[in-house]
Amino acid sequence: VKCSRSGLAATLLLSLASATPSFAANETRDAPAQAASPIYGVTIPHGYRTWQFVAPAEEADPLDELRIVLGNPTVMKALEKNTLPFPDGSIFVKLAWKRVPSTEFGPASVPGAATTVQVMVKDSKRYRDSGGWGFGRFINGQPADLAQHQTCFACHQARVRNHDFVFTRLAP
C-alpha cells in the first residue's frame, strides 16, 4: 500500500491532536495557582486545548520530539493577516512528545510520552526586556527550573528577531 506524504502528515496531525490525555495534567485548572514560570511568571492558560492549530514541528536529536503549536484567537488573527509585531494578548502554546516509531506503520513516527508544554505570552509593557514576550516551560504541569527559562529569550533573539522573536509560522 502506498501512502502519500500528505496522508502521512494528516495521520501525524490527527495523532498529535488526539493525544489529549498526555497533557490533561498540564492544564491550569489541574496545576496549583503558584505554578508560574520563573523570571516571567507565565502560567499554562486555561482552555488552551481548544485553541486553533498553528503548525506542527519536529525536533531532531538530542530531543527527538514531535510538537504541535496552538494559538489563541489573537495569535490566529495576527497570523492570518501577517501582522507583525504580534499584538499584546497573543499566546502560543507548544505541546511536545517523544517521537516513537508507529507499531502499525514502520516509516511513521507517533507521539510517545509527553515532555513539555511551552508557552509564549505577548505583553509589551510587562515583558519589555524580552522583546515583549514572557516564556514558560512546564514539565508535568510544573515550571521547569530557572536555568531553562534563562535561555528562552536569548535563543529567540539570536534566531528570529526579525519575526517578532517567534519561530512558528502558520502552516499552509
Give residue spans per PLM region.
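Short, structured beta-strand/loop micro-motifs enriched in basic residues and often containing a Trp
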Residues: 67-77
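Sec/Tat signal peptide C-region and signal peptidase I cleavage site
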Residues: 20-24
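Bacterial N-terminal signal peptides that target proteins for export
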Residues: 1-10
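Sequence context surrounding c-type heme c attachment/ligation sites in exported
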Residues: 25-30, 37, 41-65, 83-172
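Bacterial N-terminal signal peptides
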Residues: 9-19
